[in-house]
Amino acid sequence: MMHIKDHQLQILPFAPAHLDGGERLEQLCFVHPWQRADLETQLTNPCARFLVAVLGDKVVGYLGVQVVCGEGSVTNVAVDPTYRRRGIARALFGACFAAGELDFLTLEVRPSNEAALALYRELGFQPVGRRRDFYTEPTEDALLLTKTFKKEEPDG
């Protein structure tokens, strides 16, 4: 467990109690935020793997991944700007990786988001493509990154 200013950072599965915090992070972090209803649908989506980072009683980050047959796609990563560069996104991804259900994980990132790019490279993501004009406000390409997980072969 990680400590930030005398509080333990907990990585937990997204639950109804986290909706207010998730909605707040969406508003803080994104030009086109998901609405509360979008977050609520993730609670019952069998393919959704949403994790929240909770510090004290405050949701300070979350990671959303859609998983189908071992193939993961990151839908959202958000960390409260006040708590960035403290290892929260790394902890969220670490918990996601530790679940062990992924063959690979793909995400998109703005080329201008240098901090996120540096983190993703450190976590083992490799560039695999580019989506032209993917983002708006401002218009920008998305870099497509993938991390492949090695699975142990069964004996036999």
Place the predicted regions along the sequence by residue.
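C-terminal "cap" of GNAT-fold acetyltransferases
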Residues: 3-6, 106, 110-114, 123, ...
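A short beta-loop-alpha structural element at the N-terminal edge
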Residues: 7-21
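Hydrophobic adenine-recognition pocket in adenosine-nucleotide-binding enzymes
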Residues: 14, 77-79, 109
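Alpha-helix C-terminal capping segments
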Residues: 25-27, 43, 92-103
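A short, aromatic/hydrophobic, helix- or strand-capping loop or linear motif
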Residues: 32-41
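Conserved beta-strand in the GNAT
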Residues: 52, 58-66, 71-78
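Conserved acetyl-CoA-binding loop-helix of GNAT-fold acetyltransferases
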Residues: 79-81, 85-98, 114-122
